[in-house]
Amino acid sequence: MGRGKVQLKRIENTINRQVTFSKRRSGLLKKANEISVLCDAEVALIIFSTKGKLYKYATDSCMDKILERYERYSYAEKVLISAESDTQGNWCHEYRKLKAKVETIQKCQKHLMGEDLESLNLKELQQLEQQLENSLKHIRSRKSQLMLESINELQRKEKSLQEENKVLQKELVEKQKVQKQQVQWDQTQPQTSSSSSSFMMREALPTTNISNYPAAAGERIEDVAAGQPQHVRIGLPPWMLSHING
């Protein structure tokens, strides 16, 4: 049969307790040295017997160095834990504070909506009524301001449109004036051309139609024979003039 599990408890017999302490102490110091050498770890071991005798082991006999390092680590750990604890406490306090504030705001909002009024007394209801009246005054004032701003903006746009309309009307009048002048010019052009054509036809008529008017031609021939200078205006051909002079 295998050995049963040994129950750890204080050894009542003083001699046995001293013997066990001596054996276990030696084994513990040996194990500390082994883990320091094998694992390249810094190990510090301090043992006080029941009589107050000190037994210790330190890697490379640097107990003070190891203890100083331990104190720095312990202090930093304590500060970190304390900071985390304070931060956590602050967050919890802030959470409770914000939660109470949110509940108060929600309660006031319900009162403004006319809900949960049973818990309010007469004075609180009067204060709520005054608060609502002040709110309505601010709302109406803001509404009036926005309406005035809107009216001013519309008036400004109206003025701008009127100015644009005046400019367009002026341009339209100028265009109509130009079109009227163009129409008058087009109407006078055919009359001038017709007058010029008629004048040219009258000037050319005696020469082109001389054979059709013998009497008029004879009279003009006599005038020429009498020495009158009208032959310049007759426009007769040269061969007729030579025949008359001959």
From Swiss-Prot:
Name the Gene Ontology biological process terms.
positive regulation of transcription by RNA polymerase II
Coiled-coil segments on the chain, per record: none
Q: What is its main location?
A: nucleus
Keywords for this protein:
DNA-binding, Nucleus, Transcription, Transcription regulation
Q: Which domain of life is it from?
A: Eukaryota
Gene Ontology cellular component annotations, sorted alphabetically = nucleus
The protein here is known as MADS-box transcription factor 14
Query: What is the source species?
Result: Oryza sativa subsp. indica
